[in-house]
Amino acid sequence: MTLDVWQHIRQEAKELAENEPMLASFFHSTILKHQNLGGALSYLLANKLANPIMPAISLREIIEEAYQSNPSIIDCAACDIQAVRHRDPAVELWSTPLLYLKGFHAIQSYRITHYLWNQNRKSLALYLQNQISVAFDVDIHPAAKIGHGIMFDHATGIVVGETSVIENDVSILQGVTLGGTGKESGDRHPKVREGVMIGAGAKILGNIEVGKYAKIGANSVVLNPVPEYATAAGVPARIVSQDKAAKPAFDMNQYFIGIDDGMNLNI
């Protein structure tokens, strides 16, 4: 799939450069001069995260080291591009996430910090975590575990804590927090299972599970586990519906039934 995604991106870049000569050099430097998705991605991320202390050339060496040691990182990036292309109606081109979407950039940058964290290069991982937060306004701890097929839509203000888990095929909108409940240590953050959609501004706090294909309504505060296929909404959140045919991360349907008809999560 990675090669197919890259071929789509290159073809689009050629057409875009022809149609908008003012951006021809931009499309050349970001896509057309590179041989593969990894090359383009390392160039883009290095330039977005660079500063006077850590120039782009040094960052690119770090990123390419991660790709060479763990090529699956690039495969995950291709899955993420496909997820955004298929789920976001505003995204008409395969190249859009790679070029313009900071949610995608933040996730791919996190994957480098996660590699470094697992290599026990924790100081560098934390340094880059801060740079990601500054550049993209997304704060993902390097130790968090995130799968593939992930979409951070708009992404501004997303926070993912140290012991959080986000499984494959999850969609998360802006302003979401996967956080702890206080000063406790150890395993203290949410576990988000596959196919979940989390609406804008939702807060999920503590070591609780959000079951597969669940939906969290916008601005909800979730303090208790959410069953599979359930929709939870409100402050504090309650179960308002359950549909075993739903695929919320793919459908991206923000609607849910009235919360007055819901039941308390403690039931």
Swiss-Prot record:
Protein's pathway: Amino-acid biosynthesis; L-cysteine biosynthesis; L-cysteine from L-serine: step 1/2
GO MF term set: serine O-acetyltransferase activity
Annotated compartments: Cytoplasm
Reaction equation(s) it catalyzes: L-serine + acetyl-CoA = O-acetyl-L-serine + CoA
Transmembrane region(s): none
SUPFAM superfamilies: Trimeric LpxA-like enzymes
InterPro entries, alphabetized: Hexapep, Hexapep_transf_CS, LbH_SAT, Ser_AcTrfase_N, Ser_AcTrfase_N_sf, Ser_O-AcTrfase, Serine_acetyltransferase, Trimer_LpxA-like_sf
Name of one Pfam family that matches: Hexapep
Enzyme nomenclature, EC number: 2.3.1.30
GO BP, one annotated term: cysteine biosynthetic process from serine
GO cellular component, one term: cytosol
Keywords per UniProt: Acyltransferase, Amino-acid biosynthesis, Cysteine biosynthesis, Cytoplasm, Repeat, Transferase
Family according to the record: Belongs to the transferase hexapeptide repeat family.
Record PANTHER family: SERINE ACETYLTRANSFERASE
Protein's recorded name: Serine acetyltransferase
Originating organism: Haemophilus influenzae (strain ATCC 51907 / DSM 11121 / KW20 / Rd)
Gene name as annotated: cysE
